[in-house]
Amino acid sequence: ILAYEILKDMGMNLEDRTEVMMAIGNHDEATGTAVSDISAALILADKSDVHRNRVRNRDIVTFDKHDKVNYAVTKTDFIMDREKRKVTLDITIDNTICPVLDYFDIFMERTKMSKYAAKYLNIWLN
């Protein structure tokens, strides 16, 4: 509802607002899926967003598993090769902060969702 009002205040037309709201509503790992190009793009962008700067709390002792994984990621590159219709997510994880397996524990469902979103867009997720 908040996004809808913001988009409305920005002057976006009703059809486009509806499309964006549908994409937002379908990007949750538990219940969402790609239902349009916009929703597929949102899923790819959202589910690949892992990086140290997402962690506001800098007290490592108080980190939960998500904070540790995000904080351990020191580099994230989302690379789109239009000619080959391929997306590559290149991540560097400092495994002195958390093991790489913790990343997969948290991000496996997100990765699967991204795979289906890429398939919807007829691109290869690398």
Each model region followed by its residue ranges:
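Terminal helices and disordered tails flanking the catalytic cores of nucleotide-processing hydrolases
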Residues: R52-N126
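Divalent metal-dependent catalytic cores for phosphoryl transfer on phosphate-bearing substrates
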Residues: I1-R82
